[in-house]
Curated annotation (Swiss-Prot):
Keywords: Cytoplasm, Methyltransferase, rRNA processing, S-adenosyl-L-methionine, Transferase. This is 23S rRNA (guanosine-2'-O-)-methyltransferase RlmB. It comes from Blochmanniella floridana. Specifically methylates the ribose of guanosine 2251 in 23S rRNA. The gene is rlmB. Its EC number is 2.1.1.185. HAMAP family: 23SrRNA_methyltr_B. One of its GO terms (molecular function) is rRNA (guanosine-2'-O-)-methyltransferase activity.
Length: 254
């Protein structure tokens, strides 16, 4: 079984990280974009099968999504589950875990944007419930711009049970809500932590909330305005990065 991915950044990411997954690359005839030309040159040098197509054919293959003149047919990444998570928890000796839990993010664009932010923030793993999450499809991969191949993406059968497991391994659970007694910027985030983000329509579910150690919110100047979940995720993640990297009066990104 194979899947299609499209876009310069997305295909380039697979070329860089796992070219053995690529079965064939479809490219637009007579490309003009210099980035695309450079990528095609690299692909040819790697002896990967290439087929030139009209833009109309590429539009059909991508269902009229923005393919930027290149589509790759690839072997999907292996699915990760609770076994992968448990192995990570048992062998996390030399790192301070930063995990992202997405509860009910069903919009592919939001999921892709969350994955991209997670990659930029150095998240070690994304955890989603098996029955309440968008699949990592071509749209998610395009929005994630290659990040979906770098951040481990774990689907779990029971999210509440998974949060209990994280606590057993001393992972502190912080949930994002619209209103609470604690604001994000006054919350300690430098310890092993899992940040829990919910859907825009209903937030994190009741059982998920009950398994959080702390519920916090992002203060906004307009109380009637709520943030897009991917924007809120980015704010949560980079407040964590800020706290972890801030040393001796300056931010140390070394």
């Amino acid at each position: 079984m194979s899947e299609l991915v499209y876009g310069i950044h997305t295909v380039e990411s697979i070329v860089n990280q796992s070219p053995n997954r690529i079965l064939i690359v479809y490219i637009v005839s007579n490309p003009r974009d210099l980035r695309l030309k450079s990528l095609i040159y690299r692909i040819r040098k790697m002896n990967i099968n290439i087929q030139e197509c009209t833009r109309r054919v590429l539009n059909i293959k991508s269902m009229k999504s923005a393919h930027q003149g290149i589509i790759a047919e690839v072997i999907p990444m292996p699915a990760l589950n609770e076994d992968y998570l448990l192995h990570f928890l048992k062998t996390k000796n030399n790192i301070i875990p930063l995990l992202l839990v997405l509860d009910g993010i069903t919009d592919p664009h939001n999921l892709g944007a969350c994955i991209r932010s997670a990659d930029a923030a150095g998240v070690h793993m994304i955890i989603v419930p098996r029955d309440r999450s968008a699949n990592v499809n071509a749209t998610v991969r395009k929005v994630a711009s290659g990040s979906s191949d770098r951040v481990p993406f774990v689907r779990v059968t029971n999210l509440s049970r998974t949060l209990k497991l994280l606590k057993k391994y001393n992972i502190y659970i912080v949930g994002s809500v619209l209103r609470s007694n604690q604001i994000l910027f006054n919350t300690r985030l430098i310890d092993p932590i899992a940040l829990v983000m919910g859907s825009e329509s209903s937030g994190i579910r009741r059982l998920t909330r009950e398994n959080c150690d702390k519920l916090v919110h992002i203060p906004t100047l307009q109380s009637t305005v709520s943030l897009n979940v991917s924007v809120a995720t980015g704010i949560f993640l980079f407040e964590t990065v800020r706290q972890r990297k801030y040393q001796n009066g300056f931010i140390n990104y070394s």
